[in-house]
Design a protein with these regions (language model features):
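Acidic, serine/threonine-rich low-complexity disordered tracts
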Residues: 2-76, 136-215
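Predominantly extracellular/secreted and cell-surface proteins with exposed
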Residues: 76-135
Length: 215
């Protein structure tokens, strides 16, 4: 009796992965461009760790400053400056103070989840959630949930794309933002794209990225 050949199992595919970069990220000012609905948009984004520590919500914390500006057909429509407060080693976000087009808000995390030590293409998960308050008060005015997802580079190469998502409401208005970071060698090389809700419509911004995909 002739034996049938053994069936071969396909080799498992090795998914691309990179060490997670240390937080907060250090992103030099990046130019953003977009067009939507016949309008032309331009902007800048940066994320800069600050020196020293300060008090936040009753405890000593480190901080970083995130800046986002957007113009529509040459006219300013968004000026946002966030000061993010966090603990180091391990990184744990505490909250932030937010200035958005002149309005002042506070945000406190109710829960936070660190990025995994290794980012693998196809992976995703929670980053945290919290509550918005009127500045310097206990009056809650909204909430926010943050998640992440990892994808391969759209241009090939060894870099991967880490996208963080933030969705929620403030004063009854929905907010939505997605930021795509180029990750290589355990470092955030730059911002590839920003998606942000403007007047109820999500607008996709591409960045110059200044060669951050060249790996």
């Amino acid at each position: 009796m002739q034996s049938s050949p053994a069936q071969s199992n396909p080799m498992p595919q090795n998914l691309q992965s990179e060490p997670a970069p240390a937080q907060p990220f250090n992103i030099y000012q990046t130019s953003l461009t977009a067009s939507s609905g016949g309008n032309s948009y331009a902007g800048t984004y940066s994320d800069t760790p600050n020196q020293g520590t300060t008090m936040f919500d009753g405890q000593e914390a480190n901080s970083s400053t995130i800046s986002l500006t957007i113009t529509e057909n040459g006219s300013p429509i968004v000026t946002e400056i966030d000061t993010v407060y966090y603990l180091e080693n391990p990184y744990q976000p505490l909250g932030l103070t937010l200035s958005y087009n002149g309005g002042q808000f506070d945000f406190l995390y109710n829960s936070s989840d660190p990025l995994p030590s290794t980012l693998t293409v196809g992976g995703s998960g929670p980053l945290g959630s919290g509550t918005y308050f009127v500045a310097n008060s206990n009056d809650a005015i909204g909430s926010l949930t943050e998640t992440y997802a990892v994808a391969s580079s759209p241009l090939g190469g060894s870099s991967i794309l880490l996208t963080t998502y933030a969705t929620g409401t403030v004063n009854g208005q929905s907010i939505s933002e997605a930021i795509g970071y180029v990750i290589n060698g355990g470092e955030a090389m730059g911002v590839a794209s920003v998606d942000i809700q403007l007047n109820g419509t999500t607008v996709h911004f591409d960045s110059s990225c200044n060669g951050c995909w060249d790996y």
